[in-house]
């Protein structure tokens, strides 16, 4: 087994010690020849690319990424497909994504019958609903690297350069077996009716429209935006599917809480879980995941407190009651949940003085 090399490899990588990374990887590759020849070959290919001066991405058949001609910065970043759990989404959204995956699996059958297979999705919705997570999950399910547009590098102050950068990135995508992820697509696809625009925005949108139209079916393009109202109308027509990723409903919030709390979920009382469930009505999926992480941290920070109390502490911090009516409501909520036996315990959780808690509960 090669497990003993993993901590050393991680330390060397985090320390930017390329020499040791290569040496440890070589040892692992040799050790794995008998145990797992496929993994061994993958390691050796990566090392061979590095030793010949080629991009390490060539070891997974990915050409070097295009760069901005002026700054020499890469126009995108590549993430290899990694196994992740399926996103927790409302049924209609999940069904559309699964249908897209099935369509991609049947691409040859579509072509045999002269049917154009779909190759693009436009995801839109509020921040934190899971658009980027969906892109990563589709990358895993399709086993295709995810190439994400780097807006900071692609958008240039030089006339015409931004359009050329977008064109270069699409040319790269067309020659590779990858998913191109255009996150914050509204930055390069705004409506062409801005009177103050000198023409650069219109040129950029025109380039994007042409590239989307010319994309072969072997490519997969995912666009994402928090501001669908800003997109040029023609952009919508270039995507095969437009999916509104909505905020999580009650059932999805329950699943997100259970997944986020993990093994701690069995330690939380039903009453407190219900408080979290109802109190996260306006939370995005990212907000709920973040809250769960904070609750688990509190459980480690305050081992003397039971997990339900830690959950209530985080909940009160998030609600942050300011008005008198809000403070009365949260004090009564804590009193009724069965976890807070005294005025003092409610005061400690909420930060409201004991005398005020007493008055609010009368």
Model-inferred region functions:
Residues 1-34, 38-86, 255, 259-362:
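C-terminal alpha-helical "lid" subdomain
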Residues 92-96, 102-271:
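Walker A/P-loop NTP-binding motif of AAA+ ATPase domains
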Residues 15, 78-102, 109:
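Dynamic helix-loop-helix/coil hinge segments at AAA+ ATPase domain boundaries and subdomain interfaces
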